[in-house]
Amino acid sequence: MHRIPSSSAALVVIGLLAAACSSTNEHAADLVFRGGTVWTGDSLQPEARAVAIRKDRIVYVGDENGVDSLIGASTRVVTLGNRLLMPGFVDTHVHPVSAGVQLGECNLADIATIERLREVVAECNARDPNASWIRGGGFALPLFAGGTPTAALLDSLVPGRPAFLSSADGHNGWANSRALAIAGITRDTRDPVNGVIVRDAQGNAVGTLRESAQELVQQHIPPHTREEMRVGLERAVRRANQLGITSWHEASATEEILRAYTDADSLGRLTVRTVVALHVNVDSGPEQVQGLAALRDRYARPMVRPVAAKIFADGVLEGGTAALLADYTDRPGFRGDLNLPPARFNAIARALDSAGFKIHVHAIGDRAIRASLDAIEQRHGSRRVSGGPRPMIVHIQLFDSTDIGRFASLGVVASWQALWAFRDTYMKELTEPRIGPTRARWQYPLATMARTGAIMAGGSDWFVSSLDPLQAIRVAVTRQSPDDSTDAPFFPEERVDVETMLKAYTLGGAMASDAEQELGTIAVGKLADVIVLSADLRKVSPYQVTRTPVVLTVLGGREVWRDSTAFK
């Protein structure tokens, strides 16, 4: 698991031609796309030349001649030209509220050097002298030796008040001495369950807190207000619409996060369909499911579906907290720990399934992936899950190859963060030294998984990494950096083609949402969630995928974003 900077490049200038037909027709469409390529994602009709939308539904998919009768005096007609119309993107693992809030705090994303990071933190400290805490995050762990930032460094940048900054992966926190003191962390403080206080040779905390140890400090930080969380979500929604994302899965929600969604929706500002995965406390048992069901029933509405529950099976490889089947290469005798014993995992999974929840599992290490599959299999047996919510396992970084085929046989959705499938500094400095070259081969085996027929979906894990689906698609196709075409491909035998990833981010995402009857393809009767890209991604060089931006996003027949120059 690692982080890639979010793209900040401006979208290229695009022109779309719009016209209105003067004919009258009481059955006229509100919006028609014609004169270009339509990639439907539907195997029964893969391509078309025209699409018509009335209200929030697609009413026509076919050739241009057939759409003429649906064009009336008030119909808006968009001529596609060389551009591509396709279904909207679905991001199956993202943290919109926390990401949006963090954009308004001390934002350390996209920082490539320790010198620049020092400058930005110092600027954050100077910007708001009245703040009781300096908080934010997004920093890359490889900026620090061993992925371990120190309180001494943060003290020099924020000397007079407590500071706590989260790493980009969200699994590591950086505290200054004032924050450690407020939390009461001393050499005598024990590591919490599923957490690590990184210490020096004398046993003193150095300033890095891993996994649940972060909560020792976080519980003392003033919580965000209800308005701050709603405003943060609205920031995230605007960015998502710009990138063509029309549906997403909120990856781990408390009741406060649920309120942010319903607050934004009540104001008409939630323009991304949302599946919410409620946070499961791994230290508690199946008795918590009744409370989760009550939250689901209280907050459910058409645009907000709290129908999933998130279980953290393990941590991350770069922090040494992922659960492995064999020893860490750099720590003989240590394999990492599951966040909950298999018996409890299985009991929670059974209770969630019985209550009608979709199971959404974070699993990084090969042992965590196996334990997750085992928990699903013990409920359903060694057969494909059918007739209920599809379970989904996300991240799925390191596999034992014998477990890859189980996703298809059990009907488990594989949610990839494909943007991580190349050799960046996380991989070279923090991951490969921990697992060695033999196991490294089985990281992110997209092509092998695709050949099994498993349902594959795409996700960003934003704010951990870029929200832009095009960056993830480019990496999946090249197994190289999204910003560099000269680096050696990372196990190139696991490359997939563009269409595989388009399906993952559309129909695969809809299936992960258990909504493929309404979303995921362009077909008559489905919701009109569609996007226009500046060119056909299947026909450009893989290295041009990230330079083929979304220029128009339509949600339920309503335009929610367009390039400012698109309609002149």
Regions found by a protein language model. Give the residues of each.
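N-terminal secretory signal peptides that target proteins for export/translocation
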Residues: M1-P5
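Bacterial N-terminal signal peptides
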Residues: S8-A19
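Divalent metal-binding segments
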Residues: C21-R34, W39, S43-G291, V307-A368, ...
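Anion (oxyanion) recognition and catalysis
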Residues: N241, A300, D353, A408, ...
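Acidic (Asp/Glu)-rich catalytic clusters
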Residues: D265-G268, A294-V304, F407-S409
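His/Asp/Glu-enriched, well-ordered alpha-helical/loop segment
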Residues: R350-H360, R367-P391, I396, S401-G405, ...
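Ligand-binding beta-strand-loop-alpha-helix segment within the catalytic cores
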Residues: V413
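Glycine- and charge-enriched low-complexity intrinsically disordered segments
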Residues: R562-K568
